[in-house]
Swiss-Prot record:
Reaction(s) catalysed (UniProt annotation): L-glutamine + H2O = L-glutamate + NH4(+)
NCBIfam families, alphabetized: Gln_ase, PRK00971.1-1, PRK00971.1-2
Keyword Hydrolase (UniProt): yes
Residue numbers binding substrate: 66, 116, 160, 167, 191, 243, 261
Gene Ontology BP annotations: glutamate biosynthetic process; glutamine catabolic process
EC number: 3.5.1.2
Subunit field text: Homotetramer.
The keyword Hydrolase appears for this protein: yes
Similarity comment: Belongs to the glutaminase family.
Record keywords: Hydrolase
Protein name stated in the entry: Glutaminase
GO molecular function: glutaminase activity
Length: 307
């Protein structure tokens, strides 16, 4: 794998996808995301042998949004283990990421930890398990990624608080069903802070490289999580990482991954690499149009996927 010239492949892909440049639009329901240049494009691939391949705006920081939910799930599994799955499921949702209808029908148990309701439950677990939830989660993110400079972005977090009515509704509904154990405002403060983190593609590829290396971050040699739980997280990313478009991503790309409405996608090839792509224009499902196309072309050209 290390003999592949990914940088050359990136250039080929960008040239081939020039017709996709104007497709999609940036997220506008979170004011801070609406101000992003829609034409940015960055990508960074880091191999488990510490090779780096970058293209374009790979060192442009952007709001990773729902991608950060991978960290909260990882930390919840470290604390609660398999009991986590009594509070949240492992099935694709098939509905919008902030749907109330499915949640009510299923008695307040979210389908998976990556839709909003599921991530809110995971944050509730962390509020119960951690002495100082916001500080302890941030410390875990910094140490597991090997990037001590990671911070919450208070401007983005406040922007989400002001527009997060649906998330408050989800949390209160689950509270009514007994699946939120702590104060709703406290839980959502952690949730909004988590989703406010900004990283570059280069940082993001490093941060999630542990999922390509059996739970060990090659940059720090830290065992972030066990190989067994690494497998579980990758499986959920494969099935549930792209809102109601997870099947499409699995079909066309063939890698576990997670998207965010900030325009980022991180994808993992276990045993080989982690790649992050950033392009802010989104499709109707909230996934980056161009980032999905880039990753589809990458696995097609390299003939490397998990299938």
């Amino acid at each position: 794998m290390d003999a592949i010239d990914y940088k050359k492949i990136f250039s080929e892909i960008v040239n081939e996808l020039s017709s996709e440049d104007e497709k999609g639009s940036v997220a506008t329901y979170i004011p801070e995301l609406a101000n992003v240049d829609p034409n940015k494009l960055g990508m960074h691939l880091t191999t488990v042998t510490n090779q780096h391949f970058a293209y374009g705006d790979a060192e442009e920081a952007f709001s990773i949004q729902s991608i950060a939910k991978v960290w909260s799930l990882t930390l919840a599994l470290k604390h609660l283990g398999a009991d986590t799955w009594q509070r949240v499921g492992v099935e694709p949702s098939g509905t919008a990421f902030n749907s109330l209808v499915q949640l009510e029908y299923e008695m307040g148990i979210p389908r998976n930890p990556f839709i909003n309701a599921g991530a809110i439950v995971v944050c509730d677990i962390l509020v119960s398990c951690l002495k100082n939830p916001k500080e302890d989660l941030l410390d875990f993110i910094r140490t597991s990624s090997g990037i001590p400079s990671i911070e919450y972005c208070p401007v983005i977090a406040e922007s989400e608080v002001k527009t997060g009515h649906r998330n408050y509704a989800l949390a209160h509904m689950m509270k009514g069903f007994g699946n939120i154990h702590n104060d709703v405002d406290c839980v959502l403060d952690l949730y909004f802070s988590l989703c406010s983190i900004k990283l570059t593609c280069k940082q993001l590829a490093q941060a999630f490289l542990f999922l390509a290396a059996g739970g060990v971050n090659p940059a720090t040699q830290q065992q972030v999580i066990t190989p067994k739980r690494t497998k579980r997280i990758n499986s959920i990313m494969q099935m549930c990482g792209f809102y109601d478009e997870a099947g499409e991503f699995a079909f066309k790309v063939g890698l576990p991954g997670k998207s965010g409405v900030g325009g980022g996608i991180v994808a993992v090839h276990p045993g080989k690499y982690c790649i992050a792509v950033f392009s802010p224009r989104l499709n109707a499902s909230g996934n980056s149009v161009k980032a999905m196309k880039v990753l589809e072309a990458l696995t097609t050209k390299t003939e490397l996927s998990i299938f």
